[in-house]
Amino acid sequence: MRFVIAAELHFNELMEESRIATHSNHGLFQMAGLLSLSENLPWMKKSEKGAFFAREMIQNMLEMHFADDGLHLEHSPDYHLWMVNHLQSLKESGWLNGQESSLTDLVKSLEDSANWMCDTNHKVIPIGDTANNVLVTKRWRGYQGQINIGLRVFEKGGLLIHNSKAGDRFNQLVFSAQFHSRQHKHADHLNILYSLNSQPLLVDPGTFTYQYDIPERMYCESTRGHNTVEIDSLNYSRFRQDSFGSALTMVANSELCLITEGQVQHTRLISSTIPNNKIKSSDGVEVNINHRRIIIERPNFFLAVIDEVDSENEHEYIPWFHFHPDLQIRRDTTTRLGVVDDEGVRYCQIQCYDSESNSIESVEVRGQESPRLHGWYSKNGREVIESTAVGYPLVGNSYMWVTVFDFRMEKTGKPYLRRGTGGKYL
């Protein structure tokens, strides 16, 4: 009798639409539970109605949670892989009553996308709430262990992944220009990651336990913790009304070179000292800043990151670049930084110049605790270790500059950046 009463309570609760977390993956798990309950207890009065309700809700949520290009819209490759497993199990259950064909097409699309969610060492690409150093095989049972060579653009999802060969190793560029909701989203608009010869070079801070008010979690979510432009020591907004979907505006690719562009209009920023789950609309700082980022990659030769910001008011802009904990920064010349490992092996040189051919002075932080955490890397979602962050501070209304990562380091001249016709030509 207790079991029947408990089942009845579950039916009542799970068939109350206002109680379903339709905005997140939790809602899909709730409806999978209701469908399982309905199919396994067909003799209960509400089982038929419960199964119908669950199937309808699942169909509606699938349309909400996935882009047409096969990307899960929660900003995290880790959760993308979780969803592939979940939907595969749901499809194989036999409970969908005719919906299997549409779900089969979706699962196939998600599996194809999932094959791109690994870095050059077969670990899950750490965007959003994805931990560093998680093997893909621990998240997805269908992983075949192959790194896809070439370009994958999720135009509607807002993600670009470019994999290229480097002898028997691999290079990888990841450009994240996605903002669909608050789900597992960090303040990381136009963030980039880069691996060179299978060595992570530009890295993400990763994620941290879901205790939103602890400093490590707040740092891992922050704008300054990512490879993007921090403005006035504030975070980018993650209010849903500020979401822009995909900020990818251009992709051009040839055998030798990849060029991609993303653009975001910032209308408010948020204090980096407020936990994300406690931010109120009144905490927003109103701004009107356009940020355009152009990335030019010639694999094994160079990576150039061009940033253009435009505002009527003066701001402090700092493009931050975070390096893997195994790498160190040294000053090669007055205008060039070198990236080396503990054994002195050189990976690249870095230069940063504005559109007037002025070299921009760098700042470096590693393992900073005060006045705010900076220069840290969450290696497993529970512990942070020191890593080096390099920034290039600028103050003004509008600026354009380029940061070049030179992989050849063979008498390369200084970068030359010019624009014309209102920024239409570079």
Please place each PLM-identified region on the residue numbering.
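CBM-like, beta-strand-rich accessory domains located in the C-terminal region of large
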Residues: S24, I214-L426
